[in-house]
């Protein structure tokens, strides 16, 4: 199975992807240990998260962070009853890339 570039994402898809990223941020912030690690890696302070969460690039970074930590990704996906791959789909949508599977 290969991937090919697909159509650009639609506005509704982008809003859904950003909502998933906000949910991921809430999940990370839901436990002090998770939040502390995120803040340490991102270099942000807790006071700047709320403003940063309004920026697409920050939300993209949240999804990258989540995708890079498989146990965290799986826990987030399970809590939100979504497949783990939905995080990368949302990431690609926010980044302006939309991928579709090639069908034989």
Protein language model regions, located:
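Metal- and O2-centered redox machinery and metal/ROS homeostasis
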Residues: 1-104
């Amino acid at each position: 199975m290969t991937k090919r570039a697909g159509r650009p994402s639609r506005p509704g898809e982008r809003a859904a992807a950003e909502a998933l990223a906000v949910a991921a941020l809430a999940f990370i912030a839901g436990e002090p240990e998770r939040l502390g690690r995120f803040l340490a890696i991102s270099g942000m302070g807790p006071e700047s998260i709320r403003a940063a969460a309004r920026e697409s690039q920050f939300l993209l970074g949240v999804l990258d962070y989540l995708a890079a930590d498989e146990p965290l990704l799986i826990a987030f996906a399970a809590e939100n009853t979504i497949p783990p791959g939905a995080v990368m789909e949302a990431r690609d949508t926010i980044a302006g890339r939309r991928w579709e599977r090639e069908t034989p």
